[in-house]
């Protein structure tokens, strides 16, 4: 009788694996795009801001990194002057586990102000160089910015978040040619896409 019971248990377990197939990820992944634009800023030819990281906070979980658009780069630099008047560029984009997210966190590593304009090309890149001018380093007391805005990432769907980096309110001249930055960034919109129908 005992041997029959053991056999029955083994048979039931084996049958459940056969019916269920291989284990699958119950949550899946979706894609998060983080785009950047800038309010008008008129006191410079170029304002290069370098980001060290973009992260999203998942409910009841931890911070998840959002890859930069250039996935091989550890930083991403954007010229705020090229992001004025409705222009946008991708800051980060990549797959994240599905679920409800509560916050976006940005880390601004450095910033420089130039009188000359940056060369032709995209507003954001892994690096941007302006030849013939050293630029003015901007002091950043705290480069970490947390943005509270909930959104839900669905499986096989894309959610796009558009951020406004207000350069005019972020940068202040304190005298003697010294500039400081306290990043003022707001979420303009969160646009989810509909996942494909089976």
Predicted regions and their residues:
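Bacterial N-terminal signal peptides that target proteins for export
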Residues: 1-8
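C-terminal motif of bacterial Sec signal peptides marking the signal peptidase cleavage site
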Residues: 15-18
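A short, solvent-exposed, low-complexity linear motif enriched for acidic/polar residues
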Residues: 20-198
């Amino acid at each position: 009788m005992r041997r029959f019971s053991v056999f029955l248990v083994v048979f039931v377990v084996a049958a459940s694996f056969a019916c269920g197939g291989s284990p699958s990820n119950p949550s899946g992944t979706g894609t998060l795009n983080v785009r950047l634009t800038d309010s008008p800023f008129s006191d410079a030819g170029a304002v290069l801001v370098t980001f060290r990281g973009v992260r999203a906070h998942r409910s009841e979980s931890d911070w998840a990194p959002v890859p930069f658009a250039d996935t091989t780069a550890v930083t991403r630099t954007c010229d705020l002057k090229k992001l004025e008047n409705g222009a946008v560029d991708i800051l980060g984009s990549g797959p994240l586990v599905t679920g409800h997210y509560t916050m976006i966190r940005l880390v601004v590593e450095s910033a420089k102000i130039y009188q000359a304009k940056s060369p032709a090309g995209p507003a954001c890149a892994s690096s941007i160089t302006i030849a013939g001018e050293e630029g003015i380093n901007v002091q950043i007391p705290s480069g970490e910015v947390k943005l509270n805005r909930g959104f839900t990432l669905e499986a096989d769907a894309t959610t796009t978040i558009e951020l406004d980096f207000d350069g005019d309110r972020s940068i202040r001249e304190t005298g003697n040619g010294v500039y400081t930055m306290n990043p003022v960034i707001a979420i303009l919109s969160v646009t989810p896409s509909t996942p494909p129908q089976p």
